[in-house]
Regions:
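Conserved catalytic scaffold of divalent metal-dependent phosphoesterases
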Residues: 66, 70-171
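Flexible, charged surface loops at secondary-structure boundaries
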Residues: 1-2, 27-30, 64-65, 98, ...
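Structural motif
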Residues: 4-5, 33, 102-104, 174, ...
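Core catalytic region of metal-dependent phosphoesterases/phosphodiesterases
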Residues: 8, 13-100
C-alpha cells in the first residue's frame, strides 16, 4: 500500500526525553505529506538543543522542498508561525482533508483540555516532574507508574477525546489528535478518534494514512 500521509505529534525537541533517533527514522519513511500535529518543540530555548535536534530541523527543512509539510499549532509551539516560515512549513490551527470519500480532521487537542485552560501552572509543574522522573529513572518504571496513577492525566485524555468528538464528530469520519501522549484508536460510533501518541514515551508512536483512506497506528 502506498503511504499518502504520516502524522506525528508531541516530539518536544529540546526535551531530555525526546527520542530523536525514532523521529529521524520516521522522517526517512516514504510518504507524500507530513502532518506534525502540535508540540514539535518543548519550548524555544535552543540552548537545550543537541546535535540530533538540529539534525531533525535540518531534515524537516530539506523535506519541505519536496513534500507538503503541515505544522499544526500545539500548546508548546508559541513561536510556531515564525519557525514554520523559516523552515518552509504551513502553520495552521487545524487541518482537514479527504481521501477516498473519508473526511479527516486534525487538531492538537489542547483546546479541549480543561487543565490547560483553567490550571496552566499546575499543568506545567506536573509535566516538569514527569519529565524529571523520566530522566533519572532509566527503566521508566517510576514514571510509567506515576502516569498510570495520575487521575488528572486519565481524566484529561478522556475529556480531550469526548469534547473533540462532540464538536467535530458529526461532520468528519476520522478525528486525529495529539497532546495527551496517549496513543489510541477509539470507535466513537459516528466517527473514529485516533491519538498519535508522542515521541517522549517508552513506546513512541505515529500514524500512517494510506492512499485509499485506511490508516494504522504504529508503535516503535
Amino acid at each position: 500500500m502506498t503511504c499518502d500521509t504520516v502524522v506525528i505529534s508531541d516530539i518536544h525537541l529540546g526535551s531530555p526525553v525526546c527520542n530523536r533517533e525514532k523521529v529521524l527514522k520516521v522522517l526517512s519513511l516514504d510518504f507524500k505529506r507530513l502532518i506534525i500535529n502540535g508540540d514539535l518543540f518543548d519550548n524555544y530555548s535552543f540552548k537545550r538543543f543537541n546535535k540530533k535536534d538540529w539534525d531533525i530541523l535540518s531534515k524537516l527543512r530539506k523535506l519541505s522542498k519536496t513534500h507538503n509539510i503541515i505544522f499544526i499549532h500545539g500548546n508548546h509551539d508559541s513561536n510556531g508561525e515564525f519557525m514554520s516560515a523559516i523552515m518552509g512549513m504551513e502553520f495552521v490551527e487545524y487541518y482537514e482533508f479527504e481521501l477516498n470519500n473519508s473526511k479527516f480532521f486534525l487538531e492538537h487537542g489542547d483546546k479541549y483540555d480543561h487543565w490547560i485552560k483553567h490550571k496552566p501552572f499546575i499543568t506545567w509543574f506536573f509535566t516538569g516532574i514527569y519529565y524529571w522522573l523520566q530522566r533519572i529513572d532509566k527503566s521508566h518504571r517510576i514514571s510509567r507508574l506515576t502516569k498510570k496513577l495520575s487521575k488528572s492525566w486519565i481524566q484529561a485524555k478522556d475529556i480531550v477525546r469526548t469534547k473533540f468528538v462532540e464538536k467535530r464528530g458529526k461532520k468528519y469520519d476520522v478525528l486525529m489528535a495529539g497532546h495527551t501522549h496517549h496513543a489510541e484508536i477509539v470507535d466513537c460510533g459516528a466517527c473514529v478518534y485516533v491519538n498519535s501518541g508522542s515521541f517522549c514515551e517508552v513506546k513512541c508512536s505515529y500514524i500512517k494514512i494510506y492512499e485509499h483512506g485506511n490508516f494504522e497506528l504504529i508503535f516503535m
